[in-house]
């Protein structure tokens, strides 16, 4: 569950109040090489009351445009060490989400004082609104 609306980082709230998480902006086209969107996280600044961070993707106005993630190719999430640009891990979404318009891709969570990564790949119909309801938010 999200503690409050300000903990939900997305295209209308790009930076967490702690400064620990910043979304560098929404790529509306997906054109070009390399990463389309970036989220910068400083784990040392994450408030102690936050034990889990979920990474999600949605398709804006997917219903109106008859779009879903089954139509998206080459989608992935990767974790990169910003100090040396080393890729620590990469999770490919695949094209198995034929009706989903929102996906919980992965999470990082605290375990015994360390941060761990968990690939999830759980899809939702209903886009951003359905995703928000899943985390206890109303849009």
Swiss-Prot record:
- Which InterPro entries does the UniProt entry name for this protein? Stress/Tellurium_Resist, TerD
Query: Which domain of life, per UniProt?
Result: Bacteria
Q: Which residues form a coiled coil?
A: none
CDD domains listed in its UniProt record: TerD_like
One Pfam family hit: TerD
Main role? Not known; could confer methyl methane sulfonate (MMS), mitomycin C (MC), and UV resistance.
PANTHER family reported for this sequence: CAMP-BINDING PROTEIN 1-RELATED, TELLURIUM RESISTANCE PROTEIN TERD
Q: Name the family the entry cites.
A: Belongs to the CAPAB/TerDEXZ family.
Name of the protein: Chemical-damaging agent resistance protein B
Q: Which organism is it from?
A: Clostridium acetobutylicum
């Amino acid at each position: 569950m999200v503690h409050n609306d300000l903990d939900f980082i997305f295209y209308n709230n790009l930076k967490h109040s702690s400064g620990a998480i910043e979304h560098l902006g929404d790529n509306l086209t997906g054109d070009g090489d390399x990463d389309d969107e970036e989220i910068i996280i400083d784990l040392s600044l994450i408030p102690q009351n936050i034990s889990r961070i979920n990474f999600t993707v949605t398709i804006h106005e997917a219903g109106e445009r008859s779009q879903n993630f089954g139509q998206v190719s080459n989608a992935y999430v990767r974790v990169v060490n910003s100090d040396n640009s080393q890729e620590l891990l990469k999770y490919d979404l695949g094209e198995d989400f034929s009706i989903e318009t929102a996906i919980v891709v992965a999470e990082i969570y605290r375990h015994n004082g360390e941060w761990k990564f968990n690939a999830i790949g759980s899809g939702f119909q209903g886009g951003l609104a359905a995703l928000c309801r899943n985390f206890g938010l109303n849009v």
